From Swiss-Prot:
InterPro entries: PBP1b_TM. Signal peptide: none annotated. This is Uncharacterized protein in pulS 3'region. Residues 31-43 have a biased composition (Acidic residues). It comes from Klebsiella pneumoniae. It comes from the Bacteria. Residues 1-10 have a biased composition (Basic and acidic residues). Residues 1-60 are annotated as: Disordered. Residues 11-27, 48-60 have a biased composition (Basic residues).
């Protein structure tokens, strides 16, 4: 096995492809051309370049979508703020309304009731009325 007489696996006698050369594409510059010749079209203006650069503006269609989304966002923000003001007014009217209309009462008179005390039903009703207790049809809490 002296020498280089071995073939790589998979080629089966075909020669290998030549390596691809890198294609260089460079931007055409105006300095590369000689514009010293005379022609009859001197009054024509050169066409502006349309290149995709990093510092250029985005296309018009993308800018239109961006402005549309900004406008929709502003409208949504205004609507949400208006709804928040409406809910705030509704909650404040409910808190300031019927919930807090009951007067606060201080029950400062202490009455000691004991099991062996002789007190009639009329006296107990008068005592409860004097301390501003209300009569209810059913108990809601113990």
């Amino acid at each position: 096995m002296a020498g280089d007489d071995r073939e790589p696996i998979g080629r089966k006698g075909r020669p290998s492809r030549p390596a691809k050369q890198k294609v260089t594409r460079r931007r055409v510059r105006e300095e590369d051309y000689d514009d010293d010749y005379d022609d009859d079209y001197e009054d024509e203006k050169p066409m502006p370049r349309k290149g995709k650069g990093k510092g250029g503006k985005p296309p018009r269609r993308k800018r239109a979508w961006l402005w549309l989304l900004i406008k929709i966002g502003v409208v949504c923000a205004v609507l949400i703020a208006a709804y928040g003001v409406y809910l705030d007014q509704k909650i404040r009217s409910r808190i300031d309304g019927k919930v807090w209309d009951l007067p606060a009462a201080v029950y400062g008179r202490m009455v000691n009731l004991e099991p062996d005390m002789q007190i009639s039903k009329n006296e107990m009703v008068r005592l409860l009325n004097a301390t501003q207790y209300r009569q209810v049809s059913a108990m809601t809490r113990p």
